Amino acid sequence: MSGKSKRPRQRHDSSLQLASVIGAGANKIKKQIRNVERLLQKRRDVLPDTVIVEKERMLEGLKFELKEAELRQVGRKNAKKYHMVRFFERKKALRRYKQASKKVIADPENKRFQNELRDCTIDLCYVVNFPRLSKYIALYPTGSSDAKELSEEVKKGLDSTDAKRTEFRNLVAKQLDEGTLPVSLSQILEGKRLNKDSTGVMLEEEQVEEEATEKQFNDEEEEDDFFE
């Protein structure tokens, strides 16, 4: 009788342990992972198979939560690091959008004005919906140096930045047309921004993960694209 009552309780305890780390910080989750790994390492020979399976599943869940916590950490770090850049770019993009809108209202049939409004709309949506997990690439970078004075390595880096900016901008345009932007144009005009739990628009998952792991924690002293 007592043996039967322990299994549901063990499953219940494991569920509670896993639930307690959902949304928690990376350090707390790492501690839980170490505890479970230590238990499996030291007592695997004496633990029932059902408990081993349960703990291994719990371990998988904890590792998933750790990954999510690390991505949240990157998002918070980027939000703080690029706050002022995005603030000024959002103001500039919104001003340009409003100016372009007035032109279209004044002359609705003018194709040039329509194209200008389209570009300004994409720019505004780009600034607001740019992914939190990626190093922010400014739409209006400062410090335009003479190309002749730049080294080949710097030129290559600028070309790569331009290509990535275009890639993100094209994705924003696509989602704008599909109505799938995390923050829509109408919401932006109401003053809304990305929710703290939203990642923004995303490219292929591998690229986002590469940015999160390789760049965000290892390029503290690297010059930002905004200042290139």
From Swiss-Prot:
Compartments it resides in: Nucleus, Nucleolus
Residues covered by region (Disordered): 197-228
Protein name: rRNA-processing protein EFG1
Record GO biological process: maturation of SSU-rRNA from tricistronic rRNA transcript (SSU-rRNA, 5.8S rRNA, LSU-rRNA)
Coiled coil regions in record: 26-74
Function comment: Involved in rRNA processing.
InterPro entries: Efg1, EFG1_rRNA-proc
Keywords: Coiled coil, Nucleus, rRNA processing
Top-rank taxon, per record: Eukaryota
Sequence ranges of Acidic residues compositional bias: 203-212, 219-228
A single GO cellular-component term on record: nucleolus
Family: Belongs to the EFG1 family.
Chief site of localization: nucleus
